[in-house]
Amino acid sequence: MPQPAKVLLLYAHPESQDSVANRVLLKPAIQHNNVTVHDLYARYPDFFIDTPYEQALLREHDVIVFQHPLYTYSCPALLKEWLDRVLSRGFASGPGGNQLVGKYWRSVITTGEPESAYRYDALNRYPMSDVLRPFELTAAMCRMHWMPPIIVYWARRQSPQTLASHAKAYGEWLANPVSAGGY
């Protein structure tokens, strides 16, 4: 039987202790031998990112998952710093920047608003696909495969049963992340 793809789960939440939804989503991830959970805020409380170490982690994995809350239509500050430092020209893009070619990118996002808020005629004025476009473009710049994002809308208002259902589906996907279909 073939080995499952190696997954690097980059977790970026500056207030992880207060995020019930993200803690529930992380539970199945830590149970899989093919998944490396890498908590950026725990590792880099001072925001000084060890770029060579991070790039080595990326080389060792096939699927890169970016799990974080949606902050001001983007990601938390440390993840943005990580993207700018680690996905550098010559490593992930530009001349010689071929280290991530063919790997997979999947965003796993929690939001504080319902899905209905992400429409052209609604509160946020744009659908989530537009909000996440910079991440999709970054994946394309790195010549990675963009996978449909997993979004848990209105995360803090979801029932424990709904969050458990999301976590179960997420865990099943993590077990075999590049198979056809899935969560």
UniProtKB/Swiss-Prot annotation:
Keyword Transcription regulation: no
Disulfide bonds: none
Record GO terms (molecular function): electron transfer activity; FMN binding; NADH:ubiquinone reductase (non-electrogenic) activity; NADPH dehydrogenase (quinone) activity
UniProt name for this protein: Glutathione-regulated potassium-efflux system ancillary protein KefG
Database matches in InterPro entries: Flavodoxin_fold, Flavoprotein-like_sf, K_H_efflux_KefG, KefG/KefF
Keywords: Cell inner membrane, Cell membrane, Membrane, NAD, Oxidoreductase
Its biological purpose: Regulatory subunit of a potassium efflux system that confers protection against electrophiles. Required for full activity of KefB.
Catalytic reaction equation(s): a quinone + NADH + H(+) = a quinol + NAD(+); a quinone + NADPH + H(+) = a quinol + NADP(+)
Gene Ontology biological process terms from the UniProt entry: positive regulation of potassium ion transmembrane transport; potassium ion transport
Gene3D superfamilies in the cross-refs: 3.40.50.360
Organism: Salmonella paratyphi B (strain ATCC BAA-1250 / SPB7)
Main location, first listed in the record: membrane
